[in-house]
Curated annotation (Swiss-Prot):
This is UDP-N-acetylmuramoylalanine--D-glutamate ligase. The lineage of its organism: Bacteria, Bacillati, Cyanobacteriota, Cyanophyceae, Nostocales. It is an enzyme of class 6 (ligase). It comes from Nostoc punctiforme (strain ATCC 29133 / PCC 73102). Belongs to the MurCDEF family. Its EC number is 6.3.2.9. It catalyses: UDP-N-acetyl-alpha-D-muramoyl-L-alanine + D-glutamate + ATP = UDP-N-acetyl-alpha-D-muramoyl-L-alanyl-D-glutamate + ADP + phosphate + H(+).
Length: 499
């Protein structure tokens, strides 16, 4: 029996281990951490004949080496053991690559399962969720997976084969027509991070989407050029390509780098980089599929409930993807009208005495936080801070000076952020350190400044105080709802819970 080793006991690692076990591999899984939760998972997987080693790292010694190593997305691709594995000729891949191979090999060549792959520094989760909603409104079985939180290997595990029906051709894509009740997939809608692209050698989507590109994850990828080339790999391996033409970096490369791509622009037809693409004109998303085709209105922009120009960019890319897959206007309009948005991305939590509390915890870098602040009403009370990342904060600071009545700083970045605010002549800030102090203070300041919005948009990672941005956003939501329910009566309880 062939032996496989999976690194990382998160959702992706567990799904990969189970998929390999189902395919007949002897599976071992390791994680350098140990906790009560991990020990429980260890017992559950042991019952499935999957060996789990906690508090240990993979070592490649002796003769009993694995034939395959699968890494979870959070595992750096250049750690010594993986470099050694490749030198020894041990195939080393990521969890998403494993899912891609499994689903592709189970499909017939004449009816291969198409994927949409969405990547980008910011905007990819919202775009992924909106694309999946549109495909599902068109009655396609098209799960969203990957970096969005549902592992691609979980999709592979849940799929037991296609139905007995044939396939229908659509403009730019095809769809399966099921004539049995057997579970089937029509598309896979995958949000793909740079980490996942890096470890996926053969992933080749039918449609690739690139939302934005700004400096991020440079502690892992070292240089901006490396980061760009990793992202570009996914698009180069995609049959059709959709780009955000309003992104400064991507548009600068333009047709010279991507001559056959479909480009988008919220600014109108005159700003479209190529002769084909999708743009906004007179309040409509307009489609122009070829240089000679007439422009066609597809859906009203006002159908989308989410605020901000960046969400109009996300809308354009989602509509472009849907049209290239052959989905009709009615399904697109229906899905967009019903789309509620994505948690932690300008998520409206509650309204208290006329003040909206908005959760933008996913804004983990300066660019995303700048967009978040630009998208809300002013003046706003901003909560920012956490674990700082490298990047250019110029635009973010300018947006604070324009839109923020006051800034409340939390986390380890608070002193550095305070210094940067002073350097640009902005002094309406307070270091409050914790979310428990920030929420009640933000409510007080909003009343004082008559600010219509309290916005959590950290411009930082969460790891100094929280396991991830979701937990940070959930805590903000919990505190906001408690404040709205009890007002100042909750203040002392919040403060005591932070001590």
């Amino acid at each position: 029996m062939s032996k496989a080793h999976v690194i990382g006991l998160g959702k992706s690692g567990v799904a990969a281990a189970r998929l390999l076990k189902r395919e007949g591999w002897e599976v071992e899984l390791s994680d350098g951490n140990t906790s009560k939760t991990l020990l429980q998972q260890q017992q559950e997987l042991a019952a499935e004949q999957i060996t789990v080693k906690l508090g240990q790292s993979l070592e490649l010694n002796g003769d009993n080496l694995p034939q395959l190593i699968v890494v979870s997305p959070g595992v750096p691709w250049d750690i010594p053991v993986l470099i050694k594995a490749r030198q020894l000729g041990i195939e080393t891949i990521g969890e998403m690559e494993l899912a891609w191979r499994n689903l592709r090999w189970r499909s017939q060549p004449q009816a291969s399962l198409p994927w949409v792959g969405i990547t980008g520094t910011n905007g990819k989760t919202t775009t992924t969720a909106l694309i999946a909603a549109i495909f599902q409104a068109a009655e396609l079985d098209a799960p969203a997976c990957g970096n969005i939180g549902y592992a691609a290997c979980e999709v592979a595990l849940s799929w037991s084969g296609r139905g007995a029906g044939g396939r229908e051709q659509g403009a730019g894509g095809d769809r399966e027509v099921n004539s049995s009740s057997s579970p089937s997939l029509d598309w896979v809608i995958a949000e793909v991070s740079s980490y996942q692209i890096e470890s996926s050698s053969s992933l080749a989507p039918r449609i690739g989407v690139w939302t934005t590109f700004t400096p991020d994850h440079l502690s892992r990828h070292k240089t901006l050029e490396n980061y760009y080339n990793i992202k570009a790999k996914l698009l180069r391996q995609s049959e059709l390509q959709v780009f955000n033409g309003d992104d400064a970096y991507l548009s600068q490369l333009g047709l010279s780098a991507w001559p056959n791509a479909y480009w988008t622009s919220v600014k109108g037809k005159d700003f479209l980089i190529s002769e084909k693409g999708f743009y906004i004109e007179n309040g409509w998303v307009v489609e122009k599929l070829t240089a000679t085709s007439a422009p066609e209105p597809i859906v009203k922009v006002s159908t989308l409930r989410m605020v901000g120009e960046h969400n109009q960019q996300n809308l354009l890319m989602a509509v472009a993807t849907a049209r290239l897959a052959g989905i009709n206007r009615d399904a697109i309009a229906r899905a967009i009208q019903e789309f509620p948005g994505v948690p932690h991305r300008l998520e409206h939590i509650c309204t208290w005495e006329g003040i909206d509390f908005i959760n933008d915890s996913k804004a983990t870098n300066y660019d995303a936080a700048e967009v978040g602040l630009a998208s809300v009403k002013s003046p706003a009370i901003l909560i920012a801070g956490g674990e700082a990342k490298a990047g250019d904060d110029t635009g973010w600071l300018a947006q604070i000076q324009t839109k923020a009545a006051a800034v409340l700083l939390i986390g380890s970045a608070a002193p550095a952020f305070a210094q940067r605010l002073q350097e640009v002549g902005y002094y309406s800030y307070e270091i409050v350190e914790t979310m428990e102090r920030a929420v009640p203070r933000s409510a007080e300041l909003a009343k004082e400044y008559q600010a219509p919005v309290v916005l959590l948009s950290p411009a930082c990672a969460s790891f100094d105080q929280y396991p991830n941005f979701e937990v940070r956003g959930d805590r903000f939501r919990e505190l906001c709802l408690a404040w709205a329910a009890g007002g100042k009566l909750q203040h002392n309880l919040m403060l005591s819970s932070s001590l």
